[in-house]
Amino acid sequence: MGRRASREIAMKLIYQLEIQKDSREEQINNTLEQYDLNENDREYILDVVKGVFKNQEEIDGTIEKFSKGWKLSRISKVDLAILRLAIYEMCHRDDIPFTVAINEAVELAKNYSGEESGSFINGILGKVVKVKLMSADGNENRDEE
């Protein structure tokens, strides 16, 4: 299937689980059954979706910190799902370069959200990367590996 398609499924699941908060495991399993996923795709989707919700407080704090003047309740649910996915990838997945996480998030925004969303998401994620790189000891620049 590929990482891009898996990322799209993960974003849709994060969005769906934000809207319908009950029976998460059942919703995840039902959604995954709809697709012909190999083991790598399935593992990636499960890791990202479960990781977003496990780390949601931290991720949402990051979004609020860098979306000056925007409360989470003002951010569209689709944009929020995209941001949560990308920030999880950037902060908790060492196998995904920052530029890939940002570019994929912007593409998802272009396909699933409003006109301004790509710029909004790019701006927030750019600030996240800048802070991560400034606070790193030089070993965390995954884009140069």
From Swiss-Prot:
UniProt superkingdom: Bacteria
Family matches, as CDD domains: Terminator_NusB
What species was this sequence derived from?
Acetivibrio thermocellus (strain ATCC 27405 / DSM 1237 / JCM 9322 / NBRC 103400 / NCIMB 10682 / NRRL B-4536 / VPI 7372) (Clostridium thermocellum)
From the Swiss-Prot or TrEMBL record, give the protein name. Transcription antitermination protein NusB
Q: Keyword Transcription on this protein?
A: yes
What family is reported? Belongs to the NusB family.
InterPro entries tied to this protein: NusB-like_sf, NusB_fam, NusB_RsmB_TIM44
Q: Which UniProt keywords apply?
A: RNA-binding, Transcription, Transcription antitermination, Transcription regulation
